[in-house]
Amino acid sequence: MRVNVTLACTECGERNYITTKNKRTNPERIEMKKHCARDNKHTMHRETK
């Protein structure tokens, strides 16, 4: 079952990306490095509710 999740920047808190994940294979929150437009650099983005 794939669900839509929002990724938020850990430094500024802005929600920049929307992606999908499979809850069965990845039950924990996902983290990935993405570009933050507000900070203008690559930062860690974490899944939010």
UniProtKB/Swiss-Prot annotation:
Q: Name one GO biological process term.
A: translation
- Which UniProt key words apply to this protein? Ribonucleoprotein, Ribosomal protein
Give the Pfam families listed for this entry.
Answer: Ribosomal_L33 (PF00471)
Among InterPro entries, the record links this protein to: Ribosomal_bL33 (IPR001705), Ribosomal_bL33_CS (IPR018264), Ribosomal_bL33_sf (IPR038584), Ribosomal_zn-bd (IPR011332)
Give the GO cellular component terms, alphabetically: cytoplasm; ribonucleoprotein complex; ribosome
GO MF annotations for this entry? Answer: structural constituent of ribosome
The organism sits in which domain of life? Bacteria
Note the Gene3D superfamilies from the entry.
Answer: Ribosomal protein L33
Do you know which PANTHER family this protein is assigned to?
Answer: 50S RIBOSOMAL PROTEIN L33, CHLOROPLASTIC (PTHR43168), LARGE RIBOSOMAL SUBUNIT PROTEIN BL33C (PTHR43168:SF2)
Cited NCBIfam families: PRK00504.1 (NF001764), PRK00595.1 (NF001860), rpmG_bact (TIGR01023)
For this protein, the record's HAMAP family field holds:
Ribosomal_bL33
- Homology family: Belongs to the bacterial ribosomal protein bL33 family.
Q: What is this protein called?
A: Large ribosomal subunit protein bL33A
Task: Identify the species of origin.
Answer: Staphylococcus saprophyticus subsp. saprophyticus (strain ATCC 15305 / DSM 20229 / NCIMB 8711 / NCTC 7292 / S-41)
